[in-house]
């Protein structure tokens, strides 16, 4: 039986979560919870949403199946095909590209043996390119599952991939040690505490 043909239902725990999402909306507006339920289904289903999951969600929300499908196919964060345990999303927008995202893509090709849109044979990693992830000041960056890895170098990405393969959780955020989106060169203004 293919993954696509399996019936989908929320687990008891996720059904409770789904009900909590739906309860946030007024009567007659339950369909507004569709994106939250698609995310919940994706997390339960190993990182992707099947047509059966969309049908299940549409039934729960009392909406036409096509409406759930429209939402799922509109948002790029909804994966419509199986992905690896670690979904690597490389930012390819101008800032990340200028700061070296091509080298990060090359690391994935060399270390994992996959190109963009491919998964490793063991199902561990999937690589995709995405548009702006919203951390341009910390370019180049990648999102792996729900975590941001910013200020990435090719060498650091190799280390992160090795850690993930060993089952370790690499530290998230800036990989160069800077705080949030502070200037890469350090503070340049308001250095004199007596000024103001």
Identify the function of each model-found stretch.
Residues 1-196:
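Signature of N-terminal electron-transfer/Fe-S-associated modules in redox systems
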């Amino acid at each position: 039986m293919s993954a696509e043909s399996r019936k989908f239902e929320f687990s008891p725990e996720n059904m409770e979560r789904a009900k909590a999402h739906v309860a946030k909306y007024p009567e007659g507006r339950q369909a507004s919870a569709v994106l939250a339920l698609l995310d919940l289904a994706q997390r339960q289903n190993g990182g992707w949403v099947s047509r059966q999951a969309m049908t299940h969600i549409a039934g729960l929300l009392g909406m036409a199946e096509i409406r759930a499908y429209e939402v799922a196919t509109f948002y790029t964060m909804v994966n419509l095909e199986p992905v690896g345990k670690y979904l690597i999303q490389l930012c390819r927008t101008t800032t990340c590209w200028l700061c070296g995202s091509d080298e990060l893509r090359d690391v994935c090709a060399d270390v994992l043996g996959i190109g963009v849109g491919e998964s490793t044979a063991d199902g561990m990693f999937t690589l995709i390119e995405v548009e702006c992830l919203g951390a341009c000041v910390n370019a180049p960056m990648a999102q792996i599952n729900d975590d941001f890895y910013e200020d990435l170098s090719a060498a650091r990405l190799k280390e992160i991939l090795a850690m993930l393969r060993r089952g370790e959780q690499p530290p998230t955020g800036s990989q160069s040690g800077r705080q949030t989106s502070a200037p890469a060169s350090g503070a340049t203004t308001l250095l004199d505490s007596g000024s103001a």
